[in-house]
Amino acid sequence: MPLVRLQVRNVYGLGQKELHTKVDREDPKAILDDVAVSGLVGILRQLGDLTEFAAEIFHGIQEEVMITASRSNKLKMRLKQIEAKVPTIQKTVLAQTNHIHFAYTGGLEWHPRIPNVQNHFMYDELPPFIMTPYEDCREPPRLHLLDKFDINGPGSCLKRYSDPTHFKRASRASKPSEIKKKKSIQRGRDISRLASVANQSDRKTCTSLSFSGRTSTSKTASTIEIESKSDLQEHRSFSFDSRSGGEKPKRVSSSSRFTPGSRTIASVLSESESESDSPSQDLTARGSSSVSWHEKAEIVECNVLQCATDEAPEVMETNFVLDAEPVSRLKEHSAVEAVQDIKPKELEMDNEDETESEGDDFVDALYTIDSESENDEAFQATKEVQKNLYNDITEQETEKISNNFSVDETKCAATSELHLSSSPVYKSDELIHQDPWAASEISSGTHSYSNGFSNPLYDISGIQEHQESEEVESSCDTESIKTWTNGNLLGLKPSKPKIIAETIPEIVEDIDSETFQEHLREDYKAPFDWFTSSPPLDHMKISFKSSETLPSSELQLKLPDEYTFSSFQLVPETIATSLPDSDSDKDTFCRSSSYISDNSDNDNRSVSMSEQQWEEESEGIRESKRQQELYDSFHRVNAEASSLPVPFPKIETTNGCLVENVSYLQNPAEPLPPPLPPLQWMVSKIPSAGFEDNNKQSLKDALTQAFEKNNNSLTAVKKKEPHIVTVSDPKLVTKVHLKNNVRDYKQSHGNTNETEAGDFLHQIRTKQFNLRRVVRTKTSSSETTMNTNISVILEKANSIRQAVASDDGEGESDTWSDSDT
């Protein structure tokens, strides 16, 4: 409730003056009595005013109290109604087991969808201090009474004063007047400045015109020359052409300006008059009036558009006088010609959007000279020069684009041809070679060459086996090509990819065959025309084992040039391949790949590739595999008389067990082999490079027991002379260095080979698990040649083969003996 102050008047002012004015002034007692009476009257009046004010206040309070009492009475009535309804509702609520349906959801539905009402308070509920201003407000003007005097009909007068479009039109109409006022003020300021500058000197230099950061040409003009030209009516509208500056001028600024004296002032005055009258008339009346600054900006933009394809030239600096250089006239002609192409609407918009910057308006009369005549021939010459320049630049750009396109097209064509010619094609089981690297035999530790044939796919009988350990000539600068291959090249370095079992990555060899053949003929002196590559790897499965798990399988091959080769073994599946090079599906292919060791003296172990084994898919395949492997083990070496004399490198074992992979090639012209031995004799051949010392002791013990137990089984076999093929070559020099455990074994068992211990003994061990250990004695053994070792292996293999052939189901013992050895 607002507080209201009441101003109480003076007591004596409220009293009546007649009471003390009519008293005799000479009687003071009468005067005092009259004043006292008038004061009492004033007090009474003050009390009356206060009473009235209090009555108003208490009346409002009384009304508020009455309203509050009525509302309280209403609340009491509602409470009584609620009390009457609650018992019935309480019974229904208590009877319910689930009360979730009684949840209040009205507020959740109301708040997202607030009703758009005008007043949130009811009229009766507003307090009096809010309602009082509404009551005191006057009603809107009764404009509808004037509609009878308006021709637009009823409601037109109220719309006239409440329509927003009316105010928009009024504000739009007031803007041009404000712009005109600004123009007049700025022009008056420019005229005063131009007058002062014109009186300072007769000649001024125009410098430091900035076109987008570049300095334009500096030009000087003489007021005397300009005045003489004005007398001859040959003065022209001079403007800077964009080609002289080099780029499109975005903003023009000048530090000093030249003025032709009173002539410039007159031109400015005429400009202001003509511009205020009709801006569009300046375009039609060419030569009659000067060009404004807005027109000058349009001139520069039009000229820049004509030479937009020109490259930005370097800044040119020249000093010339207007009457001495005809080039300036040509530029003036082009500028005046461009003025005609400007639309009046564009100029009008520029005039309305004129900026308030003094720097821009200060250049209104700068470099502007009235022109009345034109030199048509010079102007046409300028247009021809511009056209020729544009054509030359266009031809140059087109020529550059065509050259780039032809180069790119040639590159794309060469790339596509390269991909088409270098990609190998595989069709079913056939391997189509697009390079002279044909399929070749892979043997353990050797390379198969053909003596005097060009294509191994059509000549089979000429294939011969040779052991190769030729010295590889290399240097520190050249690094061997990192291509994964199982071919017969010692110069290729394996990249050692991580190969999963039953998967072989396809390799595209990009080596030039002719260059490689010439290199091999010069360095290795190999008598062949085409290199024979490996057989197709479509059905080959390669599985790698870490060299750390089998430390005894590491071999260190020492060559004269300190190169170490790691060997790996590939075994084809039983499925026949389509190439004629593979005469037998059960052949064992081995290949040596070059691997450069950093320091072979510090470490006796060379990095070798782990052995790879076939994973048989069924038990029947395994049985047939074992039978053929047992037969193949009896034909390890079939040396030909025409073998090349190749020196064999020294082999030093690291863990005391040496396994030699001797190459062989089965001759299809030979007769069929004898019948296979019984299945009880069949053992799975597991190629291994070496075992632990304890395993070797067990194997030696088992071999000794087997040969002593079955001494009589091979007595009849020994009577027949076996067919032994001995590889004898005077150039073959092989030195085998064995450690103590190998030496003890060789001295105790004579010429029994380490390959036999690693191959046959392991086979026996897989069938007999209860073997006793044999204590070894350390003895020294002498060096033996490789020829003796191979002869012993062949003799033992042929003896067992003939024994098996002579058995032929006669019920002999199924054991072997070592009595004849």
UniProtKB/Swiss-Prot annotation:
An annotated GO cellular component: cytoskeleton
Start-end of Low complexity biased regions: 592-612
Subcellular location per the Swiss-Prot or TrEMBL entry: Cytoplasm, Cytoskeleton
Residue ranges, compositional bias (Acidic residues): 807-821
Biased composition (Polar residues): 206-225, 252-265
Keyword Cytoplasm among UniProt keywords: yes
Domain named WH2: residues: 756-774
Chain intervals for the UniProt region annotation (Disordered): 168-189, 205-289, 577-625, 802-821
Entry keywords, A to Z: Actin-binding, Cytoplasm, Cytoskeleton
GO molecular function, one term: actin monomer binding
UniProt remark on domains: Activates the Arp2/3 complex and binds actin through the C-terminal VCA (verprolin homology/cofilin homology/acidic) domain consisting of a WH2 domain followed by an Arp2/3-binding acidic motif (A), separated by a conserved linker region (C). Binds BRK1 through the N-terminal Scar homology domain (SHD).
Family: Belongs to the SCAR/WAVE family.
UniProt cross-references to PANTHER family, sorted A to Z: PROTEIN SCAR1, WASP-1
Subunit annotation: Binds BRK1 and actin. Interacts with SPK1, ABI1 and ABI2.
General function of this protein: Involved in regulation of actin and microtubule organization. Part of a WAVE complex that activates the Arp2/3 complex. Regulates trichome branch positioning and expansion.
Protein name: Protein SCAR1
Lineage: Eukaryota, Viridiplantae, Streptophyta, Embryophyta, Tracheophyta
